[in-house]
C-alpha cells in the first residue's frame, strides 16, 4: 500500500503519520519526490482503515500495491535510484561502463587489464575471483588470492571493483570490495541474498538463466527487505531454444524493468552472446534500449584466457566500444 501526501505537508505532519502507521506494526518507507512525498507501507495492511487514512488532512491518495515486490516497486519510489560507487554513478541518467577479465589470473594480468580499462574511460573494474563453472574440471578462480589481486589493481588505478560472491561463508573476504555481484546461478539463493541485505554495499544482481522478470525483482526484494536498497539489476541473457548464441539477450527486459522498478538496470552482452564479435552490437543495442550501464569482459590476450576468452574483448576493442557508446548516448540525450 502507498499513501501519497499532499504538497506542502510539513515534516512534523509526516513524522506524526509515520509514527501512527508504525504503531500498527507496519514498516514505512519514505520517498521524497520533487513535489510530493510517498509513504510505502509493508506488512499486514489489512489492519489499515483506508477510508480513515484517506480522510487525513495531509493525505492526498491511498493505493494498494498488488505486485508482490514492494520496496523495489516504482510505485513506492517513483524517482530513479542513483547508486554511487566511488566516483561512478549508476541510474537516474548516469551511465556506467563496467569492464575487466572473466577471471583474475595473475597480478600482472589484472593490473595490465585494469590500466587498459581505466584508459578506455570505463568506470568500474570487474574480475572473477570465485568462479561458478558448469564443469567441475574447469578453472574455478583464484579465490581469496584473486580478491587480493583485484585490490592491488584498484590501488594501481583507483577503479572501484566488482566481483562475484558464491556463498555466505566467504562474505568476510569481500569487506573491501566495492560492488558484490550475485551471479545468475545464485539469483534465488535466498539465504545469501538476506545476508547481503544486511551489508551496506551495492549489490549487482544478475537475472537467472531461466527466471522471469518478477522473480528477479523478488530476489531484489529479499536484499532490500533486510535494509540494503543499493541494488543494481543485470540482464545477462536467458535460456531459449536458440543455440546460435550462448544465451538470448532479452533487451525488452530493460524497458520492462524501468517501468516496474526504480532500480538501475545494466546489461551484460558478453555472457548473453558468448561471442566477442557480437558484444559491441549488443552493447550498443542495450544502450539504445535505455540501460544504465554495460558490463563487458576484457582480456589482454583472449586466446590465452583461462576462461571465456571467446567472449572477451581486447583493450583496443574496448576503447572503440566505449567511444561508440558515448557517441550514441549523446544522440539519445
Predicted feature descriptions by range:
Residues 8, 95-112, 136-140, 160-164, ...:
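Active-site mouth loops of central-metabolism enzymes
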Residues 126-144, 299-312:
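Glycine-rich, proline-tolerant flexible connector loops at the mouths of alpha/beta enzymes
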Residues 139-163, 195-202, 251-265, 311-333:
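Alpha-helix-loop-beta-strand connector modules within alpha/beta enzyme cores
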Residues 95-101, 125-127, 161-163, 180-182, ...:
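Hydrophobic faces of well-ordered beta-strands that scaffold small-molecule active sites
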Residues 121, 173-181, 197-203, 224-230, ...:
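Glycine-enriched alpha-helix->loop->beta-strand junction motifs that scaffold or abut catalytic
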Residues 129-133, 186-252:
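Conserved anion-binding
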Residues 1-97:
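Non-catalytic terminal accessory/regulatory regions of metabolic enzymes
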Residues 85, 224-286:
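Active-site/ligand-binding-proximal alpha/beta "capping" segment
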Amino acid at each position: 500500500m502507498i499513501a501519497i501526501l499532499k504538497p506542502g505537508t510539513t515534516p512534523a505532519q509526516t513524522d506524526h503519520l509515520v509514527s501512527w502507521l508504525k504503531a500498527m506494526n507496519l514498516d514505512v518507507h519514505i520517498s521524497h519526490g520533487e513535489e510530493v512525498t510517498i509513504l510505502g507501507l509493508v506488512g499486514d495492511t489489512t489492519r489499515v482503515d483506508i477510508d480513515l487514512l484517506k480522510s487525513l488532512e495531509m493525505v492526498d491518495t491511498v493505493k494498494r500495491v498488488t505486485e508482490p515486490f514492494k520496496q523495489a516497486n516504482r510505485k513506492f519510489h517513483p524517482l530513479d535510484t542513483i547508486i554511487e560507487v566511488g566516483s561512478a554513478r549508476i541510474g537516474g541518467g548516469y551511465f556506467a561502463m563496467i569492464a575487466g577479465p572473466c577471471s583474475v589470473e595473475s597480478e600482472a594480468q589484472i593490473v595490465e587489464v585494469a590500466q587498459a580499462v581505466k584508459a578506455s574511460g570505463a568506470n568500474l573494474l570487474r574480475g572473477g575471483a570465485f568462479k561458478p563453472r558448469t564443469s567441475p574440471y574447469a578453472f574455478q578462480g583464484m579465490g581469496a588470492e584473486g580478491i587480493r589481486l583485484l585490490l592491488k589493481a584498484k590501488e594501481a588505478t583507483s577503479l572501484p571493483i566488482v566481483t562475484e560472491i558464491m556463498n555466505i561463508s566467504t562474505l568476510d573476504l569481500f569487506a573491501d570490495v566495492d560492488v558484490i555481484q550475485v551471479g545468475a546461478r545464485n539469483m534465488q539463493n535466498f539465504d545469501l541474498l538476506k545476508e547481503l541485505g544486511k551489508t551496506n554495499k551495492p549489490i549487482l544482481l544478475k537475472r537467472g538463466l531461466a527466471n522471469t522478470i518478477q522473480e528477479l525483482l523478488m530476489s531484489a526484494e529479499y536484499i532490500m527487505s533486510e535494509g540494503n536498497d543499493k541494488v543494481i539489476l543485470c540482464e545477462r541473457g536467458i535460456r531459449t531454444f536458440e543455440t546460435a548464441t550462448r544465451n538470448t539477450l532479452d533487451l525488452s527486459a530493460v524497458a520492462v524493468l524501468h517501468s516496474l522498478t526504480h532500480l538501475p538496470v545494466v546489461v551484460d552482452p558478453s555472457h548473453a552472446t558468448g561471442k566477442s564479435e557480437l558484444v559491441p552490437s549488443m552493447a550498443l543495442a542495450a544502450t539504445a534500449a535505455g540501460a544504465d550501464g554495460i558490463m563487458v569482459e576484457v582480456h589482454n590476450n583472449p586466446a590465452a584466457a583461462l576462461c571465456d576468452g571467446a567472449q572477451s574483448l581486447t583493450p583496443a576493442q574496448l576503447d572503440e566500444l566505449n567511444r561508440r557508446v558515448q557517441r550514441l548516448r549523446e544522440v539519445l540525450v
